[in-house]
Amino acid sequence: PEATELQTAKTGKATVSATVIELAQKIGLGDCGVVIGATQDLDQFGIAHIRTTDLGVPILAPGFGAQGAKLASLKDQFGASSARVIPNMSRALTMAGPDSVAKLIDKAKLEL
């Protein structure tokens, strides 16, 4: 949320977010990836095209669990790029405590 103003700023016709994604695609798989929050409005950031076009690079997606994104909605949020997503729900896991982590992981697997 703190970086919204920067990430939605325009560099020519595209947002900074879209430009970063384009650069990551040029570098290619294996050398670069992007971070896209699972709770972000992709339209606002000018990157809604990731739902219809596979980015071809890994996407680290924080925001699952405690921040509100549901693993079951991963494909809706990321569309054609969803196979590239590494969902992150570390806050939910640490908040669950050591006695509940295994149960939370099992529940998360069922959502996928």
What role is predicted for each listed range?
Residues 2-3, 67, 94-95:
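Short, acidic Gly/Pro/Ser/Thr-rich loop/turn segments
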Residues 22-29, 76-80, 110:
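Generic secondary-structure signature for well-ordered alpha-helical cores
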Residues 93-111:
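Non-catalytic structural scaffold of enzyme domains
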Residues 5-10, 45-48, 71-73, 97-99:
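Short, well-ordered secondary-structure micro-motifs
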Residues 34, 39-88, 92:
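A C-terminal functional module that forms or caps the active site or interfaces directly
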